[in-house]
Amino acid sequence: MPNHPAASPAWLSTWMSAGAALSFLLMLSAPSGYSVGGGMLLLGGLAIWWTGRCTRHPHRADTSGQASAPWTVEDRTLCALLLAVFAINTLAVLWHGDSGKYLDQGVRYLLALPVLAGLRRIRLRLDWLAVGLALGLFTTAGIAAWQTRWVGLARAEGFVTSAIPFGDMALTMGFWCLMGAALAATQRRWAWTALLLAGSLAGTYAMIASASRGSLVALPILAILAAIALLRRVHLRPLLGGVAILVAATAIVLATLPVGHFAESRYAAALDEWHAYSQQGDATNNVGSRLEAWKAALISIPERPLLGWGHAQYNTHLQDLISAGRIAPFAGTLSNTHNQFIEIWLHQGSLGLIAFLSLLIAGFWYFCRRLRAPDPTVRVLACCGAALPSAFAAFGLTQVILGRNNGVMFFLVSLAVLWAAMRQAERDAETGGA
């Protein structure tokens, strides 16, 4: 990649900004909603690459791309790690002779490369992203209310594979809205503050309606990141005001709405299930079955540490463990290990786990380096970016969230968009927006 990316035509900035906004607008509110925005970003990224190769005369390019920050070691490292995750996943699938369907999620890490590179060469319209994010959460909350109040579902699941990723992604997007509202409040942009705070409330409602217990694990992490980025005297009053409104609204939902009572019962049941497993060996409940699946995987991983087990091979091996009485039979009914890290370690070995952890850690660290930047926009975008890998690490403790198309698309698109937006804001802060 060139150190100083060439400018791209103005229409590509519009196209990529629209693709990013549509990704957040449709991610949880439309069937396969991730495909529309993600497809636009991929096509736009390829078009930017092509125009960069074909353009020989700088005056033909629009100046909208001139303010993009130069490529650094950080950019190249993120691209290399995305490529490494793809390569090791492909190697493991081919080595084990697994079905081609297990290449699906891995290929998306490869396709994220032109998206990331393209976004780094245009000017993202942050106001479009904010509107897409807020409107996406409004429709998500509406769908959650419709499913729980009129369709009769016990847990809102939107149009994704289950209630768990629905709640997790709603929480993440809601946190981003809250951070955006805090930034807008410090700039006295009250209309934007109201819009984004309402989006955060909508995301919180959708998370509660999903009754996702794994989401709670991420909350302390998000709170710490927000505190590091925003706890300055000038930000304290709007931040505390927004948090107070959010906490009050959450308490009202939990105390008065049926979906709140159901969520509370789910959280309390987790402790009962833990006691049933630890004291009575009951592996038939949600908590016990997950722990038994982890036990089976951790028994098996040392036998094939480098590239792990093929899916068909492991299913046969698991039945052998059950027959030998080492694992409870109920573990054999689960579709996966319900842990992102163990799942990768089991089926891609230590190589796959190292590549995946490296991507999470590098992304987290690169964003965290800007949490105390002088410019508030850079700090807020850094906080939102750092929240992505850390929240997904927390979500991955109890589910294979990146084993689903919606989960991996949300993660990769958000990583590319937030990284490009933060680097753009960083450049603007250095040059005065020139």
Locate predicted features:
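Alpha-helical transmembrane segments of multi-pass inner-membrane proteins
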Residues: P2, L22-F24, G44-A47, R121-L153, ...
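Aromatic-anchored transmembrane helix interface
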Residues: R76-A87, H96-R121, D127-L137, A141, ...
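Transmembrane signal-anchor hairpin modules in multi-pass inner-membrane enzymes, especially those
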Residues: M1-L91, L111, R121-D127, V131, ...
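Long extracytoplasmic/lumenal interhelical loops at the membrane interface
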Residues: G281-K295, E303, L307-Q348
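Hydrophobic transmembrane alpha-helices and their immediate junctions
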Residues: A324, Q348-S390
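Transmembrane alpha-helices of multi-pass inner-membrane enzymes
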Residues: L42-I48, A223, L359-A362, G385-A434
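Perimembrane helix-loop-helix junctions
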Residues: R53, A112, P220-A244
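A membrane-periplasm/extracellular boundary helix in multi-pass inner-membrane enzymes
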Residues: Y205, A209, L230-G281, K295-E303, ...
